[in-house]
């Protein structure tokens, strides 16, 4: 039997991804957290049924959210990242020697 994750955008549109295995599933105090292993996108993180990131394309989001502002604000030194997620934004910020990075995020339940 095939296993698919579907994200519903409108009543007439959904995006589906074939899943090899569900790696994690938990309802936290804040949201439903699921992690899937997929053949096309690698690991996929969903929150409340919405895709947040995939291994295959996370760099696109992280690079754009970091390097565009850093190019505009060349004197940035102290940076606070709220909602650090997978750590990709923090990873990209560490490419800049001049910055000190602090971050915070919700802790996943154990």
Label every model-predicted segment.
Residues 1-39:
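N-terminal auxiliary segments of SAM/dcSAM-dependent transferases
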